[in-house]
From Swiss-Prot:
GO MF annotations in UniProt: ATP binding; DNA binding; DNA ligase (ATP) activity; metal ion binding
Alphabetized HAMAP family for the sequence: DNA_ligase (MF_00407)
PANTHER family per UniProt: DNA LIGASE 1/3 FAMILY MEMBER, DNA LIGASE-RELATED
Signal peptide (residue range): none
Keywords for the protein's UniProt record, in alphabetical order: ATP-binding, Cell cycle, Cell division, DNA damage, DNA recombination, DNA repair, DNA replication, Ligase, Magnesium, Metal-binding, Nucleotide-binding
Descriptive protein name: Probable DNA ligase
NCBIfam families with a match to the protein in the record: PRK03180.1 (NF002868)
Lineage: Bacteria, Bacillati, Actinomycetota, Actinomycetes, Kineosporiales
SUPFAM superfamilies per the UniProt record, alphabetical: ATP-dependent DNA ligase DNA-binding domain, DNA ligase/mRNA capping enzyme, catalytic domain, Nucleic acid-binding proteins
Known function: DNA ligase that seals nicks in double-stranded DNA during DNA replication, DNA recombination and DNA repair.
CDD domains in alphabetical order: Adenylation_DNA_ligase_Arch_LigB, OBF_DNA_ligase_Arch_LigB
Gene transcribed to yield this protein: lig
Tree of life domain: Bacteria
Amino acid sequence: MLLADVVATSTAVAATRSRTAKVAAIAGLLRGLDPADAELTAVVAAYLGGSLRQRRTGLGGRSLSGLPAPAGEASLEVAEVDRRFEEVAALSGPGSAGRRAAAVADLFARATGEEQRWLRGVVAGELRQGALDALVQDAAAAVAGVPGPDVRRAAMLAGSTVQAVVAALRGGAAELAGFGLHVGRPLLPMLAASTTSVAEAVAGFAGPVAVDTKLDGIRIQVHRGPEGVRIATRTLEDITARLPEVVEVVRELPARAFVLDGEALVLDGSGRPKAFQDTASRTAQASGDAVVPYFFDVLHLDGADLLDVALRERLAALDGFVPPRWRTPRLVTADPAAAAEFAAQALAGGHEGVVVKDLDSPYAAGRRGGAWVKVKPVHTLDLVVLAVERGSGRRAGWLSNVHLGARDPATGGFVMLGKTFKGMTDETLAWQTARFRELQTGEDGYVVTVRPEQVVEVAFDGLQRSTRYPGGVALRFARVVRYREDKTAAEADTLETVLALAR
């Protein structure tokens, strides 16, 4: 199969908002595969989901700059592209950077313009084509003639959409039924929907709910079985060797085999959580500040799989063998006022907020459903647009990703805090494209620089330390609320205001 076929499908998926049309486009490509060719099926499934099979390639922004002119005709095969990235990922030692750059240049020289744009996006992890794993799973179900939930459950248990797609196309329902929970093999974690109101979250369920403190750490999934302890991140990366203190905690728990879901974070001397970056930095290595685990769910316990058991029963099992000091703080209540007070206490303690959970719900891994609802405070700032990037896929022809800056009275200029393409309707995209063309002062490839005059109200979940931006901080999960035509750049929020939020 040609890479051009994958790129064309990705482009078609990105060009529509219809979920049905997206699934149909992906299914059309999957039908062209030989189900017996598991290797090619796996690569195509990964590419349709917007990722490479290689977790790390060593490629960054510099590696993708100054690339050769595109080829005039499509000739790259999917299997060859995967093989090239496998070779690049294996490079190490003295001179590897040069060999990596040469290999990438050779690959890109054989790619057309559309293929180069797609390759840049997938390497950088910024491929905005709308083909999320859930769509690929549904497309595989349609091609294989099996229920969508069967593919989704197999993906959950395997910890891999790619494996589930290969199984569905090759063996249908029979092969999908062979997937099960195995202690020691990470599975996809359950995700939460979002709201800004604790009362609204509680009112969405009948009867009492579990209200968990939302800790600002890294998600961990802990497996203990005959082969020992294994710790995986939300993305299923094995970090066991980096968290020896967590391994010791798990070894002391009074059970033979189990799978726990939780968070790990670094605390300061007073017991308050340190900044997320401190936890992220510590969990990237095997030494440093102690990492403390907090567990909020159990998926398997001594031979019994608990995925399909109601949360209230899973919590009872969790409380039965995990001491309170290692459990996420929790309140069970049907009273919105009590839940709101618990959330206020969590925020006062330096935590992110709370997660409200349906006590009757099973563990629906890998899906952001309504059984769990996270509630976090939302901050807004009035910032100035410094530049904007040309859109791709469905946003081709528009100016999309805006670069955001805070006012710096000390210099009279602006300090960049991040960028976002979130929160934009088609009307917003059309308006901002016209507006920023009016303000344009230059253009370098995909980035259009503009006069710093347009104020935009931006919502975000918090701030994080950053060495990328001169202010030392960056916005977390920023999205556009509205453009403030009633404000001038001189009225935008200052860097001092932003830094005060970080303290």
